[in-house]
Amino acid sequence: MNTKELIASELASIIDSLDQEAILKLLETPKNSEMGDIAFPAFSLAKVERKAPQMIAAELAEKMNSQAFEKVVATGPYVNFFLDKSTISAQVLQAVTTEKEHYADQNIGKQENVVIDMSSPNIAKPFSIGHLRSTVIGDSLSHIFQKIGYQTVKVNHLGDWGKQFGMLIVAYKKWGDEEAVKAHPIDELLKLYVRINAEAENDPSLDEEAREWFRKLENGDEEALALWQWFRDESLVEFNRLYNELKVEFDSYNGEAFYNDKMDAVVDILSEKGLLLESEGAQVVNLEKYGIEHPALIKKSDGATLYITRDLAAALYRKNEYQFAKSIYVVGQEQSAHFKQLKAVLQEMGYDWSDDITHVPFGLVTKEGKKLSTRKGNVILLEPTVAEAVSRAKVQIEAKNPELENKDQVAHAVGVGAIKFYDLKTDRTNGYDFDLEAMVSFEGETGPYVQYAYARIQSILRKADFKPETAGNYSLNDTESWEIIKLIQDFPRIINRAADNFEPSIIAKFAISLAQSFNKYYAHTRILDESPERDSRLALSYATAVVLKEALRLLGVEAPEKM
């Protein structure tokens, strides 16, 4: 039980009109620590108690009694709690030194499944920085949900079907070179894709030709299928190399094509339930009662099925296959209307589990303020970007620690971690401007800054040859260590908030705060000097390292022992 829960529990025992959960939501952290560690505002009780909030606060303060509090005072309408530093620090250090990386593990999920639809790049197109957001947010959410007791299923819903394959087949047949594609598949296919789009703007017949080839593909034409399979296989080899670089794994690569034979069943169910209406020759589902103006277009007038039909088939398949408790789609915010339609159609079909589906949108990555576009060839490709980040990290590591043995390995962890961390520290729904120099900096709110704080602590622990005792009698009561203790104690709640809001940035910001607090402590405290507090200071350093490493792991970022 953390201190906020303890305070809420104590207050609930003497307040009749509010339960523990309601009290917990009202608790605040005073901006000035001189006003206490936690405050309870008594305003909400004034109406029920028919007393002034100041009087209520004074009465509550008088009744509070626990050894976890140094003192409890009423200041105006607030009850201010000053926690007993020695007691709380002893509890926190005991918990972390005993539980180690399992500190803050929870069993909220009871091993139920969370399906995460993430990454999902388009076949035959390069893996750009735009795809990175879905990949790293999804991967981090997977770690976060596992930490609180869920099992996760990471699905890479590949964009491996659609008219773009008609375009690619036409381009390849006109200008393609088999050897060049084999040597550099994505580069060559991108050149072909950009070229056919540029030429189609002046020559509409190319569009018609592409549609014709896609029709052939849908009808199982041998040549079209062979080219499609080849484009898919070559792209996947390249994608998997990048996923290995990012240390991201998937449980399923079932993409759009996987659902080709599963969509008719969806149309049949909609038809049987009387949900399909005809509109200008097309078949649609009316969703006005859900406040959605545009109907869901299920089948076009030429009989072709649409994106939503495929996603309905995927949702039904995943529910049947994984019996999920939650199904999360980590997809850009421009798809918000689509996912509202998807949930509404599933609701119309009578599936209560549509409530368990969540669209987790995210903002755009720009370069110098400009939007990125594959079609126009204006992209930041991930592979050369990772190589550049690793190279920049290595230069800084060589300057800081020329004797370091495994420089390349550490530079890779720092370079890749820098890109991931920068993305994840940004509030998910905000975009950000891609700035490699800022990402790889060891100063400021960056991944390398947090990694370096962790490596510095490991260096201190090695010098002291410190091994924590699970029954160690550790406790501290100074102001600098108290800031760190409060953060470490808050870690379980931070993880819950990140899960509840599908927001890894909560953990990234926490990691920055913890690293900053420790660096401040390190600057003011002679940790290694002989003193009665030496072991407790080392235990605090150890606990900080454990929590920093775990916070980074939840973001999919490595924590090198030396830097």
Swiss-Prot record:
Keywords: Aminoacyl-tRNA synthetase, ATP-binding, Cytoplasm, Ligase, Nucleotide-binding, Protein biosynthesis. GO terms for cellular component: cytoplasm. InterPro entries: Arg-tRNA-ligase (IPR001278), Arg-tRNA-synth_N (IPR005148), Arg-tRNA-synth_N_sf (IPR036695), ArgRS_core (IPR035684), DALR_anticod-bd (IPR008909), Rossmann-like_a/b/a_fold (IPR014729), tRNAsynth_Ia_anticodon-bd (IPR009080). GO terms for molecular function: arginine-tRNA ligase activity; ATP binding. One of its GO terms (biological process) is arginyl-tRNA aminoacylation. Pfam families: Arg_tRNA_synt_N (PF03485), DALR_1 (PF05746), tRNA-synt_1d (PF00750). A motif ('HIGH' region) lies at residues 121-131. This is Arginine--tRNA ligase. It comes from Streptococcus pneumoniae (strain Hungary19A-6).
